[in-house]
Amino acid sequence: MIDFDGYRPNVGIVICNKAGQVLWAKRFGQNSWQFPQGGINEGENIETAMYRELYEEVGLTKKDVRLLWASKYWLKYKLPKRLVRSDGSQLVCIGQKQRWFLLQLLSDENLIDLKTTKSPEFDGWRWVSFWYPVRQVVSFKRDVYRKVMKEFAGVLLNESKKPETVEKPRVERTEKRDFQKRDNQKREFRKSARMWNNSHQKGKAQ
């Protein structure tokens, strides 16, 4: 499917592990590496397309990951002239427009499978540092990768700073009330003692 501007709607997927590294995949039969990505079918929901591509390209399902973020806007890149092609109609694909997703791997990495289809996209993968792909991806995708990773970096930073929610034990509030009660009792006792002492001294004087 190609839009009237010549761009093919596409989803891109960044998968991170708990160490903050990202999954970097090698294109089948090539010395070219990239993030998983794939086209959106006509009438297909963007998120549905993402989970479909996730399974087709790396063998993971929705239960294996946690969706951390989805880019709000389309990001475009143009293809080099040698890669420009027609879809069989009068429309010519001049590039991709992409919506990107940041996922955190929850399952064991051994579940990653590059051979779920008869025509796999990748024949190898590895974990790399977060910014590594921006420097290593093919030049015509580099600007999109830079924007995506800049947006996702803020998301991961916020994730790492999230404190664990710990409810203050109810006993602490109870103890605080008990201390206040004892303080009030002490003040009342001292007040009564002074009144009794004054009254006793007056009785002696009489």
UniProtKB/Swiss-Prot annotation:
| Keywords, in A-Z order | Hydrolase
GO CC field: cytoplasm
Disordered: region residues: 162-206
Please state every residue range assigned to the domain named Nudix hydrolase.
Answer: 6-150
Q: What is its EC number?
A: 3.6.1.-
Indicate, by first and last residue, each region the UniProt record lists as having compositional bias (Basic and acidic residues): 162-191
Q: Which PROSITE patterns match?
A: NUDIX, NUDIX_BOX
What Gene3D superfamilies does the entry give? Nucleoside Triphosphate Pyrophosphohydrolase
One GO term of the biological process aspect:
mRNA catabolic process
Query: Residue numbers of motif Nudix box?
Result: 38-59
Q: Enumerate the cofactors the protein uses.
A: a divalent metal cation
| GO molecular function, a single term | mRNA 5'-diphosphatase activity
What is the annotated role of this protein in its UniProt record? Accelerates the degradation of transcripts by removing pyrophosphate from the 5'-end of triphosphorylated RNA, leading to a more labile monophosphorylated state that can stimulate subsequent ribonuclease cleavage.
Protein family membership: Belongs to the Nudix hydrolase family. RppH subfamily.
Q: What protein name does the entry list?
A: RNA pyrophosphohydrolase
Upper lineage is: Bacteria, Pseudomonadati, Pseudomonadota, Gammaproteobacteria, Pasteurellales
Q: Which gene encodes it?
A: rppH
